[in-house]
C-alpha cells in the first residue's frame, strides 16, 4: 500500500527544476489565473520564509511588505498553476524559518544579500 502511494506522488512531481532556492532568498513566482474565460499570469515577489513538507505536497511561504502592510502567501511547489519561479536575490540567513519577519517593516524586514556560490537544499 505504501509503495502505491509513493508511486502516485512521484507521478505528480514536476519534472522541471523549480527548487533552486533556499529560505531567505527573494523570488518571483508566476501563477496562472483564470478570470472569466481569460487566462492570465500573475506574479508575486517576496522573501521565502519557510519550506515545508516534501514530495508533491511541498509548500513555500513568501513574505512581502506592500504599502506598509505585511503580506504572506503560500504556494504548493508542484502545483500545475505555477508557471515559473525566478530567483531575484540570494539571502544570507542562519535560520530554517523566518517567522520573525512577520511583524517587521522597513529596514528591519530586510535580509542580507549573499554573494557567492551556493547549492540549494534538496
From Swiss-Prot:
Matches recorded under InterPro entries: Ribosomal_bL19, Ribosomal_bL19_CS, Ribosomal_bL19_sf, Translation_prot_SH3-like_sf
Signal sequence coordinates: none
Question: Which Gene3D superfamilies does the entry link to?
Answer: 2.30.30.790
> Its Gene Ontology biological processes?
translation
Top-rank taxon:
Bacteria
Q: Name one GO molecular function term.
A: structural constituent of ribosome
Q: Which Pfam families match?
A: Ribosomal_L19
The alphabetized UniProt keywords are: Ribonucleoprotein, Ribosomal protein
User: Which GO terms of the cellular component aspect does the record hold?
Assistant: cytosolic large ribosomal subunit
PROSITE patterns linked: RIBOSOMAL_L19
| SUPFAM superfamilies in UniProt | Translation proteins SH3-like domain
Q: Say which family it is in.
A: Belongs to the bacterial ribosomal protein bL19 family.
What biological function has been recorded for the protein in this entry?
Answer: This protein is located at the 30S-50S ribosomal subunit interface and may play a role in the structure and function of the aminoacyl-tRNA binding site.
Annotated HAMAP family: Ribosomal_bL19
This one is known as: Large ribosomal subunit protein bL19
- Source organism of this protein record: Chlamydia abortus (strain DSM 27085 / S26/3)
Q: Give the gene name.
A: rplS
Amino acid at each position: 500500500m505504501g509503495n502505491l502511494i509513493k508511486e502516485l506522488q512521484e507521478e505528480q512531481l514536476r519534472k522541471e527544476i523549480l527548487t533552486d532556492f533556499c529560505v531567505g532568498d527573494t523570488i518571483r513566482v508566476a501563477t496562472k489565473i483564470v478570470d472569466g474565460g481569460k487566462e492570465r499570469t500573475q506574479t508575486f515577489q517576496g522573501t521565502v520564509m519557510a519550506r515545508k513538507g516534501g514530495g508533491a505536497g511541498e509548500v513555500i511561504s513568501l513574505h512581502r511588505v506592500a504599502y506598509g502592510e505585511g503580506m504572506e502567501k503560500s504556494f504548493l511547489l508542484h502545483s500545475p498553476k505555477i508557471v515559473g519561479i525566478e530567483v531575484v536575490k540570494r539571502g544570507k540567513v542562519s535560520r530554517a524559518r523566518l517567522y520573525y519577519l512577520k511583524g517587521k517593516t522597513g529596514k528591519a524586514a530586510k535580509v542580507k544579500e549573499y554573494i557567492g556560490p551556493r547549492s540549494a537544499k534538496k
